């Protein structure tokens, strides 16, 4: 039954974001659930990415004798070219790596971090409430010091088999020679155009030639990104944080500081001091399986474990063809989300009760409430060992998401 739960949960995660309401045309992009299948699985390795070009690059690396990490680096670099709106080099991420020989599960945290000049109230209104999403994300204070390149470099140094430069070649060729932009990329450029890009002549020159997104039927080239990738291939990941590329990044941030005097800017120490964090995986036993995922500050892993644990308390899951199954799944996700939004934060700000939130007694009480409560939005629970909520319960507001 657990395999069925995982399958149903995966189907739901891939489809519900597009169905969520209300939706603005300027929201962060959602999934394309109607897209036809573009790949099949065979052999002893599977590659799954958001773009077939990235998947093909990863498969080619594996066929050339590369490790899974080599394939990962190649795929992520290609995504930076073909999906810059979602997977650019200036972002961040988490990585789980299983070393079968050592029987060791490793979690690396390469998420963005706030610069040293940040203050706790940078993105708050005078009332103490968070700024609206659109206003907050338009401010330079919302830009975090990127971790993607450091994450890829660190894991490649540990588990890579092919030369670092070799893994970046497919991305360099695509950026230099061009590719036909996907509907997702063109749609994201259109959203940015509606929101406003007057502050970035570079964006307009690259993504809005003649005032319009790149045509879908002609190759789109990004020579500047090709040069960036070539520098990374030649000088390695650290050059992004301490070399020529770091100087370019700091110059760009200084330009933002000139346009917005209240922005305190970045210093060389912000980039030079960036470090990937190694964390312990978050694991939970469910039936005969031990399920492991990424711990906080990621909140999605805990939510998935809670959702599965809640569903495991029900006997009403008869299969994907039954609407009741989907209703229960949606409710379980909503209840897990209530805990996620309240309890999960940056571990630097204090302990997070991940164990109590997965405690069997607590899960059982939440499952009973889930099945007996009306369909109103659930509130966060109080897990065992805690006498009171540490801060006020959140207002019911719609969460702004990002690319699935």
In which residue ranges do the predicted regions lie?
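Internal maturation/activation junctions in enzymes
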Residues: 264, 316-404
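Bacterial N-terminal signal peptides
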Residues: 4-15
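Noncatalytic scaffold domains of N-terminal-nucleophile
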Residues: 21-56, 60, 68-236, 240-242, ...
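Acidic, low-complexity N-terminal propeptides/linkers enriched in Ser/Thr/Asp/Gly that mediate export
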Residues: 282-283, 291-293, 299, 397-404
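Protein kinase glycine-rich loop
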Residues: 306
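Flexible, polar/acidic helix-loop-strand segments at domain edges
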Residues: 302
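Internal mixed beta-strand/loop scaffold within catalytic domains of large alpha/beta enzymes
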Residues: 63-75, 106, 391-404
């Amino acid at each position: 039954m657990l395999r069925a739960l995982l399958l149903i949960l995966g189907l739901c995660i891939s489809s519900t974001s597009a169905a969520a309401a209300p939706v603005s045309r300027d929201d962060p992009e959602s999934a394309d659930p109607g897209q036809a299948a573009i790949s099949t699985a065979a052999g002893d390795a599977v590659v799954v990415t958001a773009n077939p070009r990235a998947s093909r690059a990863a498969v080619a690396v594996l066929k050339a004798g590369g490790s899974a990490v080599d394939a990962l680096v190649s795929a992520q670099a290609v995504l930076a070219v073909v999906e810059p709106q979602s997977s650019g080099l200036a972002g961040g991420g988490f990585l789980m790596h299983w070393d079968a020989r050592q029987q060791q599960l490793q979690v690396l945290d390469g998420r963005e971090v706030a610069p040293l000049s940040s203050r706790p109230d940078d993105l708050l209104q005078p009332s103490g409430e968070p700024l609206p999403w659109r206003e907050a994300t338009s401010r330079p204070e919302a830009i975090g010091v990127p971790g993607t390149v450091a994450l890829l470099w660190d894991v490649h140094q540990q588990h890579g088999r092919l030369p670092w430069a070799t893994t970046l070649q497919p991305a360099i060729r695509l950026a230099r020679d061009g590719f036909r932009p996907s509907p997702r990329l063109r749609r994201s450029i259109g959203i940015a155009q509606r929101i406003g890009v007057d502050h970035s002549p570079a964006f307009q020159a690259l993504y809005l030639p003649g005032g319009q997104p790149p045509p879908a039927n002609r190759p789109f080239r990004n020579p500047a990104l090709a040069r960036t990738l070539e520098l990374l291939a030649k000088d390695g990941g650290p050059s992004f944080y301490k070399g020529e590329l770091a100087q370019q990044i700091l110059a760009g941030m200084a330009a933002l500081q000139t346009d917005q005097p209240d922005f305190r800017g970045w210093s060389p120490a912000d980039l030079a001091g960036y470090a990937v964090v190694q964390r312990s995986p978050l694991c939970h036993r469910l039936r005969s399986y031990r399920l492991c995922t990424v711990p906080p500050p990621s909140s999605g892993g805990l939510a998935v474990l809670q959702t599965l644990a809640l569903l495991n308390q029900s006997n009403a899951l008869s299969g994907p063809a039954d609407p009741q199954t989907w209703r229960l799944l949606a409710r379980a996700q909503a209840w897990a989300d209530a805990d996620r939004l309240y309890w999960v934060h940056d571990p630097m700000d204090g302990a997070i009760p991940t164990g109590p939130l997965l405690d069997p007694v607590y899960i059982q009480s939440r499952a009973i409430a889930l099945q007996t409560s009306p369909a109103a939005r659930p509130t966060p629970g109080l897990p065992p060992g805690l006498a009171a909520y540490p801060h006020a319960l959140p207002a019911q507001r719609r969460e702004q998401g990002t690319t699935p």
